[in-house]
């Protein structure tokens, strides 16, 4: 390393300065050697310049004929010049409801900016925020308005309300659609939620609306449709938030059929339907059922030993349920301390 902090050495032993282009004489040597027929890799070894640097310089020279380096340091040229900023402030002051992209289009239409040197939408928004802070205006005056809502209000002679401030309020104007316009837009939305540019153009002509307004209307209408569908789905699944998937069991489903030795249920009072979380599964088999080839039967029945009406116990002989590979210890755990029956034998079903 030579001259710390100034020069660095590449893998070929050549010195270079970080962040600075090659000197012009070195560039001229690269071009002369390339014109004489030398390959870039040989030029790289002779001049001790990296192969990538040689290839870039030659490629740019063959493409544009320019040998000098591009601009050194700095940033991109500022597009929001003082005249442009002043015009942006003037447009926003005259029409506070203007979008940033509308201001951008107006700047191009007036010839103040060329197509390739127009401030971006984010740059215009930054200018508006800076003007708002400098002038101390309320945030609603210079803020870029949100998208137009597809609101259907009273009929209006024009497609849009005149742009301007509401006296005494900081609210922006909304587009007002006549009933015929709203009906045409809604009918097209029912045919397809994503109309192409041709369909939007025809609809804009038929409704006397700007095509941008039609596009924004469809965007907002799709968002409204998604909200409605989500609400409809949530209304259909009231227990989805708790993760409940077992349906409620009405008292009439609870069977009074009993197995030998089970507690009689005829004297139990009628109960309101209980939630799915208020039922537990317990298995009980009588000795004679252990000899059968059919799975044990289960039924949902309220548990009266627990001191409440929340936890029902399963009594046999109600609902046929296949219970594979259940051993006695697991069955005893499922029955808990209910004391309804003591399983002693359990068969295994495939």
UniProtKB/Swiss-Prot annotation:
GO molecular function: DNA binding; DNA-binding transcription factor activity, RNA polymerase II-specific; RNA polymerase II cis-regulatory region sequence-specific DNA binding; sequence-specific double-stranded DNA binding
Location(s) in or outside the cell: Nucleus
UniProt KW keywords: Developmental protein, Diabetes mellitus, Differentiation, Disease variant, DNA-binding, Homeobox, Nucleus, Paired box, Repressor, Transcription, Transcription regulation
Main location: nucleus
Coiled-coil features, chain-numbered ranges: none
Function comment: Plays an important role in the differentiation and development of pancreatic islet beta cells. Transcriptional repressor that binds to a common element in the glucagon, insulin and somatostatin promoters. Competes with PAX6 for this same promoter binding site. Isoform 2 appears to be a dominant negative form antagonizing PAX4 transcriptional activity.
Name of this chain's protein: Paired box protein Pax-4
Organism of derivation: Homo sapiens (Human)
Gene: PAX4
């Amino acid at each position: 390393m030579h001259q710390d902090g100034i020069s660095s050495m590449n893998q070929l032993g050549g010195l270079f300065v970080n962040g600075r282009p090659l000197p012009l004489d070195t560039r001229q040597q690269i071009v002369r050697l390339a014109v004489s027929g030398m390959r870039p890799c040989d030029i790289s070894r002779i001049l001790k310049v990296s192969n990538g640097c040689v290839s870039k310089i030659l490629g740019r020279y063959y493409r544009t004929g320019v040998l000098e380096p591009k601009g050194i340091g700095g940033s991109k040229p500022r597009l929001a010049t003082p005249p442009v900023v002043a015009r942006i402030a003037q447009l926003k002051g005259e029409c506070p409801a203007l979008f940033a992209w509308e201001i951008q289009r107006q700047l191009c239409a007036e010839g103040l900016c060329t197509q390739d040197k127009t401030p971006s939408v984010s740059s215009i928004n930054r200018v508006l925020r800076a003007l708002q802070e400098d002038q101390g205006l309320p945030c609603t005056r210079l803020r870029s308005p949100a998208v137009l809502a597809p609101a259907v209000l009273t009929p209006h002679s024009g497609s849009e309300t005149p742009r301007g401030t509401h006296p005494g309020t900081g609210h922006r104007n909304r587009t007002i659609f006549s009933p015929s316009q709203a009906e045409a837009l809604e009918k097209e939305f029912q045919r397809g939620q994503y109309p192409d540019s041709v369909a939007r153009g025809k609809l804009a002509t038929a409704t006397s609306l700007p095509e941008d307004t039609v596009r924004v209307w469809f965007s907002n209408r799709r968002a409204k449709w998604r909200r409605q569908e989500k609400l409809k789905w949530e209304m259909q699944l009231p227990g989805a938030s708790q993760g409940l998937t077992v349906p409620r069991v009405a008292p009439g489903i609870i069977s009074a059929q009993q197995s030998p030795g089970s507690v009689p249920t005829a004297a139990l009072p009628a109960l309101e339907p209980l939630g799915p979380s208020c039922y537990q599964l317990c298995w009980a088999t009588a000795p004679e059922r252990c000899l059968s080839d059919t799975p044990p039967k289960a039924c949902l029945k309220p548990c009266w030993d627990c001191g409440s009406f929340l936890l029902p116990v399963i009594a046999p002989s109600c609902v046929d349920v296949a219970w594979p590979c259940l051993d006695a210890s697991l069955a005893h755990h499922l029955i808990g301390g209910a004391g309804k029956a003591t399983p002693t034998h359990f068969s295994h079903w495939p």
